[in-house]
């Protein structure tokens, strides 16, 4: 077990550096990350990243000059193997404190493709919206609820990521790493 703990330290150090230093120093302005709430008759699609492990919404950053919705479709394809239609914007989740950024969340539906994990997201799985895993990072619960509520207009929510968010993320990550249940549900 000590070898597994030692392997986590570089990952946590990288995430700490990114969370404390990198986002405010971006030359292109505030960081915007794009996420998709992908819904189908199978449920909602969630993924687990290879670095900080816990269930989350697929998505990521735009390349320089890339429109947000195009970046979202590209990231979802890379991470899940699915091509999606972006139906509507759910909202902007403005996060201050650790890893300050805005998460721009869209409701999506799958068009084609086969669900497959990637090196970046080794686990991808459908979940019933009424039975989400307890290892879902808590900062994804509000965007999921907003997407499922089919609100008439996009929302803007402000969240502060302090020590509670950091410790919650670490607990989920450690549980996923050391659990025999690789899905963490």
Name every feature range the model reports, one short phrase each:
Residues 1-35:
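Acidic, metal-coordinating catalytic segment for phosphate/diphosphate chemistry
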Residues 53-54, 120-185:
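Nudix hydrolase/Nudix homology domain
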């Amino acid at each position: 077990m000590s070898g597994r703990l030692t392997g986590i330290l570089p990952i946590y150090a990288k995430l700490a550096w990114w969370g404390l230093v990198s986002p405010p120093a971006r030359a292109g302005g505030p960081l915007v990350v794009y996420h998709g709430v992908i819904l189908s008759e199978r449920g909602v699609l969630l993924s687990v990243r290879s670095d900080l492990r816990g269930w989350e919404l697929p998505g990521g950053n735009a390349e320089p000059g890339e429109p947000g919705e195009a970046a979202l479709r590209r990231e979802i394809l890379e991470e899940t193997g699915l091509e999606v239609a972006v139906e509507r914007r759910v909202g902007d989740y403005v996060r201050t404190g650790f890893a300050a950024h805005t998460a721009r969340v869209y409701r999506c539906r799958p068009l084609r493709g086969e669900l497959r994990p990637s090196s970046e997201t080794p686990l991808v799985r459908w979940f019933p919206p009424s039975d989400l895993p307890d290892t879902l990072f808590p900062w994804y619960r509000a965007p999921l609820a907003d997407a499922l509520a089919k609100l008439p207009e996009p929302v803007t929510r402000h969240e502060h990521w302090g020590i509670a968010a950091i410790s919650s993320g670490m607990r989920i990550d450690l549980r996923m790493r050391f659990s025999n249940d690789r899905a963490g549900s």
